[in-house]
Amino acid sequence: MDRETLAARIDHTVLGPTTTRADVLSVVDDAEAHGMNVCIPPCYVADARDHASADRTIATVIGFPHGTQATSVKVAAAEHAHADGADELDLVIPIGRLKGGDHEAVTAEIAAVNDATPLPVKVIIETPVLTDAEKHAACEAAADADAAMVKTATGFTDGGATVPDVSLMSEYLPVKASGGVGTYADAAAMFDAGAVRIGASSGVDIVASFAE
């Protein structure tokens, strides 16, 4: 893997509750300088799209960070993000429904959001709060709903991406590893486990720590 390929597999991320427009535009500038994608709050998608080059991939989040919104609200948010210029959607599943055993509802929600726009949907399953059986069920729901990827975590619960979780998830769909990936060594471990994308607020550091 060369530096350009690495950068193209990173979603440089800013999603904190105090994120400002200036923060988002700074992340876009970093992404432009290094060849990364960005993942940003939905309220700034239009600003980022206006600021970024036409070929810069902009992802945003739906149902973030806890996944507790009604499905109709998530569908509307997906449609709004698409209209504002988003290229990809990172969707948080209804975690409580999964843990309560209502797997059909989880699948139906993912499918509803997936069908609402032509954008690829990366399904955030929040691995730190799931048992292995629940991780399998969440990934199966995402696969059954024709999602594009599964993603480990939001970063809003304790824990993040782990090699065993990425390996498990990659049995079902391509994996975005997010949470605690701060260096190239971290990213390489995730890629070796089966991840195809990294989500990180430290995207610049990951690229900078790469040695060809």
From Swiss-Prot:
Entry's EC annotation: 4.1.2.4
Q: What is its main location?
A: cytoplasm
Read off the Gene3D superfamilies from this record: Aldolase class I (3.20.20.70)
**Any one Gene Ontology biological process term?**
deoxyribonucleotide catabolic process
Location in or out of the cell:
Cytoplasm
Q: What class of enzyme is it?
A: lyase
The family assignment reads:
Belongs to the DeoC/FbaB aldolase family. DeoC type 1 subfamily.
Name of protein: Deoxyribose-phosphate aldolase
Origin organism of this chain?
A: Halobacterium salinarum (strain ATCC 700922 / JCM 11081 / NRC-1)
Q: Which taxonomic lineage is given here?
A: Archaea, Methanobacteriati, Methanobacteriota, Stenosarchaea group, Halobacteria
Gene for this chain: deoC
